Amino acid sequence: MSQPIIVWFRQDLRLDDNMAVAACVEANAPMIALFIDDRQHERQAGAVSLWWRDQSLQALADELQRRGSQLILREGDAASQLNQLIDETNPQAVFWNRQYYAESIARDTAIKADLQARQINVESFNSTLLFEPWQIRSKTANTPFKVFTPFWKACQTHGIDTRIWDAPMQFLAPSKWPQSLALTKTNLPEGAHALDQWQPGEAGARKTLHRFLSENIHGYADGRDFPAKPATSRLAPHLRWGEISPRRLFAETSAAPVSDNDQRKFFAEIGWREFSYQTLFHNPNLKTTCLQPKFEAFPWREGAEAEDDFEAWKNGTTGYPIVDAGMRELRQTGYMHNRVRMIAASFLIKHLLIDWRRGEAWFWERLADADPANNTASWQWVAGCGADAAPYFRIFNPIIQGQKFDPEGHYTKRYIPELTGLSGKMLFSPWLAKSDLLENANVQLGQSYPKPIVEHDFARNRALDIFKALA
């Protein structure tokens, strides 16, 4: 029997359309599937995302077992664990799919040099993105794009590969399996009790895609902004851990009976993910440093009052129902509707003047789909300090946003049942309701539901004055 190949899984917890797995199969070699919990060289995933990862690893292990293989689990420094496994199994090669953030790039570069010095063949592949983050560049300046629209146009002009590789139903096994740690399960943080709606793993990702293409994508271009409608793909957590490839999303959506408008909008959302990874690759300090340096001088609020406001925002007790509904959805489900993410992020940054990095860290901790590129790039976009960022004067009015995008109040009342008796404008600004209306709705401001922690017009003008001074 030929020597095995170690396939090191990381952010690619699937078998189909996995280029490292494909290369192993094409080499006709036994596969040793490896996952290393390396917390030293990667930004530690938040509690909810770790919960998802552990569920996904179990699904991957089960699928490998059905196909005559196993998942080998190790923990600790990746270089040390790889070298130890090499000593145990004498492989002909080590394959992996590339990651694109600074810590992983530095680690992988060092490991590749070390293994090559040991005469071990090392190959890496792109199985995470449609394009490598260095691939699409401005033709005029030969530099990375800083604006999304021309970037995505260049991607489409280049052409998107939609060929899908399907994994075999049976893998070659090594003559002897190495030892593996047992799978562990991360406990969910306090308050996260409604995650049974998800099915982590490759099979769950495929089901989610097929449900989206058969039902929710119709009317997606407009409906995706309304949080009460089932009009989003809900694929983000599956993409986060590589349970499905963006190439498959493109291929299957292209083949589905979908309107051009809905298809174009969905593809653009995949494009934003590509743009975020390009931005992160070329700006490795993205999670800590504003892309526009002038924003480093922004006078963020600090002190006891700001801390109280930050806690109110995290807990969904700001007194602005659409913001609070989103923050409670996040706490309970590990997810927040995209439109509401923008509203909640804008409120923290522009109403409360609290550093976007603190909001990014909270989303990182509580989102199942907390992605190293998307999460940071999105927060910088809302703050106005990132690539192709929202203009500083775009300050969402949370009252109007609620009325416009949750007109029946179904989403808001789902997460704030104490306001079930209110409707229309009063639902989104209960402090303006007359006392008899509040009494009939069984709402006691300051007791059953909080009063606003800041007045909108005051907060808006305060933020505009500061942003204008920086502009």
Question: What name fits each language-model region?
Answer:
Residues 1-163, 262, 374, 457, ...:
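Trp/Phe/Arg-rich N-terminal binding region typifying the photolyase-homology
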Residues 20, 56, 60, 205-212, ...:
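Alpha-helical packing segments of well-folded alpha/beta enzyme cores
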Residues 48-55, 73-74, 95-100, 125, ...:
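Bulky hydrophobic/aromatic packing residues
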Residues 53, 202, 228, 316-319:
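Generic alpha-helical segment signature
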Residues 78-90, 114-124, 169-183, 386-391, ...:
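Short secondary-structure transition/capping segments
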Residues 120, 141-296, 405-406, 410-471:
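Glycine/tryptophan-enriched, flexible segments
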Residues 230-424:
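Active-site-proximal binding-pocket segments
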